[in-house]
Amino acid sequence: MALTPQRGSSSGLSRPELWLLLWAAAWRLGATACPALCTCTGTTVDCHGTGLQAIPKNIPRNTERLELNGNNITRIHKNDFAGLKQLRVLQLMENQIGAVERGAFDDMKELERLRLNRNQLQVLPELLFQNNQALSRLDLSENSLQAVPRKAFRGATDLKNLQLDKNQISCIEEGAFRALRGLEVLTLNNNNITTIPVSSFNHMPKLRTFRLHSNHLFCDCHLAWLSQWLRQRPTIGLFTQCSGPASLRGLNVAEVQKSEFSCSGQGEAAQVPACTLSSGSCPAMCSCSNGIVDCRGKGLTAIPANLPETMTEIRLELNGIKSIPPGAFSPYRKLRRIDLSNNQIAEIAPDAFQGLRSLNSLVLYGNKITDLPRGVFGGLYTLQLLLLNANKINCIRPDAFQDLQNLSLLSLYDNKIQSLAKGTFTSLRAIQTLHLAQNPFICDCNLKWLADFLRTNPIETTGARCASPRRLANKRIGQIKSKKFRCSAKEQYFIPGTEDYHLNSECTSDVACPHKCRCEASVVECSGLKLSKIPERIPQSTTELRLNNNEISILEATGLFKKLSHLKKINLSNNKVSEIEDGTFEGATSVSELHLTANQLESVRSGMFRGLDGLRTLMLRNNRISCIHNDSFTGLRNVRLLSLYDNHITTISPGAFDTLQALSTLNLLANPFNCNCQLAWLGDWLRKRKIVTGNPRCQNPDFLRQIPLQDVAFPDFRCEEGQEEVGCLPRPQCPQECACLDTVVRCSNKHLQALPKGIPKNVTELYLDGNQFTLVPGQLSTFKYLQLVDLSNNKISSLSNSSFTNMSQLTTLILSYNALQCIPPLAFQGLRSLRLLSLHGNDVSTLQEGIFADVTSLSHLAIGANPLYCDCHLRWLSSWVKTGYKEPGIARCAGPPEMEGKLLLTTPAKKFECQGPPSLAVQAKCDPCLSSPCQNQGTCHNDPLEVYRCTCPSGYKGRNCEVSLDSCSSNPCGNGGTCHAQEGEDAGFTCSCPSGFEGLTCGMNTDDCVKHDCVNGGVCVDGIGNYTCQCPLQYTGRACEQLVDFCSPDLNPCQHEAQCVGTPEGPRCECVPGYTGDNCSKNQDDCKDHQCQNGAQCVDEINSYACLCAEGYSGQLCEIPPAPRNSCEGTECQNGANCVDQGSRPVCQCLPGFGGPECEKLLSVNFVDRDTYLQFTDLQNWPRANITLQVSTAEDNGILLYNGDNDHIAVELYQGHVRVSYDPGSYPSSAIYSAETINDGQFHTVELVTFDQMVNLSIDGGSPMTMDNFGKHYTLNSEAPLYVGGMPVDVNSAAFRLWQILNGTSFHGCIRNLYINNELQDFTKTQMKPGVVPGCEPCRKLYCLHGICQPNATPGPVCHCEAGWGGLHCDQPVDGPCHGHKCVHGKCVPLDALAYSCQCQDGYSGALCNQVGAVAEPCGGLQCLHGHCQASATRGAHCVCSPGFSGELCEQESECRGDPVRDFHRVQRGYAICQTTRPLSWVECRGACPGQGCCQGLRLKRRKLTFECSDGTSFAEEVEKPTKCGCAPCA
């Protein structure tokens, strides 16, 4: 039947056709949409590293490539990818995926590549890939898969690459790989596989890469087929080894003969146990009975998968489980009790317990839980017991327990909870017991409801108490009255020793500022703190992170930045960063600036910056980067500014900057570019691109040096022959001596003596066997991901307690066939993941008990081929290996004789007996010096390299000092020579020959004339040990060096101590400096070439001259001009201020209280005494009044301002509040009070504004209090004075009588900066009464530990201490030595912490001042002029003189001298005391001078020093100090 058009439709389309059009339009719109946080380019959707917790919605239907890696996705639901029929590549690696629902990939029929590696998958659902016929590459490595089911890969018939390595696979079902006939790559290494069904790999003719090593293969009859299969394929399956039985352990499977694959019992008829995957099974390490699965204390780090579905109780306490993944217990619907106590759990998935309708007991105490996710207990309607005590929970959401209507006991004891939202326990209708103690509760107004709840429901049995505020500290919450729970800005709620969390009802918490750092707003300042790594806990609200000027060397990929979604800027400049791990900045998508200036980076690769998708500025200045390749900046498409200034860059690969699509500024200056053919592209690229570069220049070759790259013609970029292919490729992360495959590094049989450089930091398996190591390389501890280390067949003779530190992930350690004799007790400390340890083939005789205390996961110990001494000291090892059969039955005893040849595993422990001490040879292995190996009184020392070392006495050598060195017994030295035996390897001798003989045995007469000294024609005649000179007639002396008689005393013509020298021509005079002439008789004129300056006169002296300076000049050459005129001359600083010359500018340093350019104004006053005041008399009639002043006091009451009489305005402090009384002429008068109190000792600003009939009062800029009066408007009365701080008695009485003031007390404290109508008032223009002193000492200089600071005392601020405290700073308990003292008529004076003495009043004496009658004062008549009187029993009253004085009455001043001083130099600037940052040395001139002279500095030294002041400022200034004192005319 034909379809008729719908009424109103002009197009004539039927309803189905309209729906089709609408669907097509919607599909077209959906194809172009892009999910939030993702970027879409063509058919690629990139959502990696955005912090997603679930698959985003609205993915375009035409997507072909989807990047979801590096997020926090926990589960893949069936419909997450529905409709993505064109998807070819799906990246899901590096998430938290714990489960994938069957059918999730059914719509993706074009899917070719799927990566699910590095997740938390435990179970692989069957038929998961049944509709993915195009799938060619599947990566499931680095998960927690425990089995491969038969139908796991059914449907994926085109699969070529399958990676299953690094899981926990222990079972492979028969036929699991049967359909994969096109498979080329299969990895099953690093699992727990013990056996494999027959012919599992026979259907893979194209297989070229196959890995099965690092498993637990048990080579019995069921695995015989694998040996033949591997032999037929010698290039694959390398290093596949047997782990059992003991006789085959360590052998390559391909090398084991068929006859050696044997089975016990029925032999080959025995069947391989099938994988029970459907209904679950009891985990191997647990025990199961009657529905209870017991896995207590088994060293588990994760919850076992594939548990029995029928279990009703699971016990997992006392393990190392760190998290509860999504849906961990959901399949086990019959569970009634779960015990996860005493683990390391820090995270719980919201749906971890989903669907457990029968659960009545959940035990989670003793973990590290900080947060309970929303809905984590949802649906647990039958739960009766919930134990959450002994965790680190800091916040509970109000709806956390909304479904627990049947809960009877809830324990939140011993957590970090500071507050609970009202209604948290409302849904707990059946609650009978509640534990809340040992939490740092803040008992403010927000917790009032809890007190009411506990009084109404007395179910809290642990005595929960308040931690703050101080007034309620340690009081039980249920016993505090409701009105005590109040919120006050004055009270501090931070609890020392706890983390300060800022929480709301939704538990969106932010941690406090990192230790030692400063946080202001959203900026975290951690610069200059010598940090070696980035702090682990940073507030999530941080927008700028400053880490510059520290000592950070490696940036580790810890996932820190995934939590900092608001971060915009990171500053890591001026550190020591040499390595950035790939993925370090994963999740930092909002960061726009990254500063890495002045570090030690040598290369950059894209993985370093992965996650910085929003980066716009990248600063890499001042590093050591030598080369930029085309993968260096991949992914940084938004970078606009890139600075590579001042690096070591010589070349850049073509296309290196092509991915930087937004680049506008590129700084390449100060780099040594080698402008050869490799760089030709860059010159052309710079000319074509419109970006700012600063014109980088060539450094090489010489003919292009300093020429800008863009100015070099293309033909001039030339290469030498053979260099055309040399490019800038990233260095391979593998040493030259080794072979690397993924994270496996093999350096076997390379004669290595030290660890090669360049081993990748992420190495997991390191093979160093067959080398020449004598010690375990110390650098191994830097590779924290190591899982296997093979050091077998080396020459290692000893281990230390730190040989294997930081190797917490190590599972296999092979030390076989070395020279180990002794194992230190802590050698394996911290190796909690170690499962296989091989010490086979060493020289170990004993092991100390407890050596394996930390290796709790150890299941295989190889200790055979060692001479074990099986006495009582090794009994523990026998018992230990029998538990779990950790030793395969190879190790045998070598002694004592009755135990020789017996197996360690099967010999009863009681047979290990001590009949006496072990032999010396056994004991000496751990203490080799016990056997006294050093002979001839040599000294023995234990040595980690040589086992022991002998220090030999003189005359012996050799390892044990056994070789004598007496080579002189045959008297080989002739002619009286002395023989000396040599020490050392040659054991020779030397002869000390007498004078005149030489040679090895002193047999040759020495020709002494070879180096004779005869001169002037003298002839040498040889003797024995000497020679003589035969001189001509005119010479004499031993060497004929003297002329006869020419310079005798009678004939010597030389004057002025000149030296006479005889010559054949006659005597010659050699003058002393300063004289000249033939006879040295003339004084030389030294002023001939003098250098005196500034018109100075030269004065000739002997061999020198002096400069006589003109007036005003000084210096050795009169080079120092007169000192410039002091700028303070003519400057008059008032009120006792000093003038200081600062940079040729006079500055007045005011005394406390004064201000102004010349300190002419008194701005602050201190009301010290009672009944004092200031009086302003010259006031003006102002129609409006605006009065502002700053006040500091600790008093409750006091008058601040008063003006007028009948028409008045009064400002007073009343009970800590500011009260303003105002009467414009109407009655009654009006008054307002401030909401704030200001009597806390701190300065507060009081502002009073009157306008017409209105008065505004504001404290510290806060919200004003307003008062309106309908009388006439008020004006400041010029006829009546303005009183400040008090008023006269008559005025006070009148005002009090008229209720204008409520308390007549005068003000006691500080007032400063009084403004009247914006004019700063000068207190010197007032009538100041006694008791008012200038200046205010602010409380910021005084710290009162247990009290309140008050800045109103005459000497300065004082502390008002709390009860029980005393001392200047309220820091001394009152129960000091003077507490309860016995002084009757006197004052107690503490001598130390325990003792005191009594200082008696006049008229009393005695130790306790209890004797009447004053003791005669011995010093009464003695007047010491420069010192003080002192009385003693031996000398009576005498004077003790001050330094520089002497005499009986200290009346004689000592001679002028300089007393050395080393101290800080101090000056005062205003209120601040400033001192130098370091001490300096000078002399203090003291003493008297004869005549009219003065003792003063003769030599002065000027230096420029840095000062730091008490107010936080600093400055630099020249200081002149004397270094030498003496008498000189008085200045």
Swiss-Prot record:
GO molecular function: calcium ion binding; heparan sulfate proteoglycan binding; heparin binding; Roundabout binding
Domain CTCK, chain residue ranges per copy: 1456-1531
Pfam family, any one: LRRCT
Domain Laminin G-like: 1163-1336
Keyword terms of this UniProt record: Developmental protein, Differentiation, Disulfide bond, EGF-like domain, Glycoprotein, Leucine-rich repeat, Neurogenesis, Repeat, Secreted, Signal
Domain LRRCT: 215-265, 439-489, 671-721, 866-916
Residue span(s) of domain LRRNT: 34-61, 273-309, 504-540, 725-761
EGF-like domain location: 927-962, 964-1003, 1005-1041, 1043-1081, 1083-1119, 1124-1160, 1337-1371, 1374-1410, 1415-1451
Tissue-by-tissue expression: In adult brains expressed in the hippocampus, cerebral cortex, and olfactory bulb but not in the cerebellum. In embryo expressed in cerebral cortex.
GO BP of this protein: axon extension involved in axon guidance; axon guidance; axonogenesis; dorsal/ventral axon guidance; motor neuron axon guidance; negative chemotaxis; negative regulation of axon extension involved in axon guidance; negative regulation of synapse assembly
SMART domains: CT (SM00041), EGF (SM00181), EGF_CA (SM00179), FOLN (SM00274), LamG (SM00282), LRR_BAC (SM00364), LRR_SD22 (SM00365), LRR_TYP (SM00369)
Compartment(s) where it occurs, according to its Swiss-Prot or TrEMBL record: Secreted
Signal sequence region: 1-33
Taxonomy, superkingdom: Eukaryota
Keyword set includes Nucleotidyltransferase: no
Coarse class of the protein's main subcellular location: secreted
LRR repeat coordinates: 62-83, 86-107, 110-131, 134-155, 158-179, 182-203, 310-331, 334-355, 358-379, 382-403, 406-427, 541-562, 566-587, 590-611, 614-635, 638-659, 762-783, 785-806, 809-830, 833-854
Example of a GO cellular component annotation carried by this entry: extracellular space
InterPro entries in alphabetical order: ConA-like_dom_sf, Cys-rich_flank_reg_C, Cys_knot_C, EGF-like_Ca-bd_dom, EGF-like_CS, EGF-like_dom, EGF-type_Asp/Asn_hydroxyl_site, EGF_Ca-bd_CS
Positions bearing carbohydrate: 72, 192, 406, 571, 630, 762, 801, 806, 1026, 1079, 1186, 1256, 1303
Disulfide bridge partners, by residue number: 286-295, 443-466, 445-487, 513-519, 517-526, 675-698, 677-719, 929-940, 934-950, 952-961, 968-979, 973-991, 993-1002, 1009-1020, 1014-1029, 1031-1040, 1047-1060, 1054-1069, 1071-1080, 1087-1098, 1092-1107, 1109-1118, 1128-1139, 1133-1148, 1150-1159, 1310-1336, 1339-1349, 1344-1359, 1361-1370, 1378-1388, 1383-1398, 1400-1409, 1419-1429, 1424-1439, 1441-1450, 1456-1495, 1474-1509, 1485-1525, 1489-1527
Function: Thought to act as molecular guidance cue in cellular migration, and function appears to be mediated by interaction with roundabout homolog receptors. During neural development involved in axonal navigation at the ventral midline of the neural tube and projection of axons to different regions. SLIT1 and SLIT2 together seem to be essential for midline guidance in the forebrain by acting as repulsive signal preventing inappropriate midline crossing by axons projecting from the olfactory bulb.
UniProt subunit comment: Interacts with ROBO1 and GREM1.
Protein name per Swiss-Prot or TrEMBL: Slit homolog 1 protein
Organism: Rattus norvegicus (Rat)
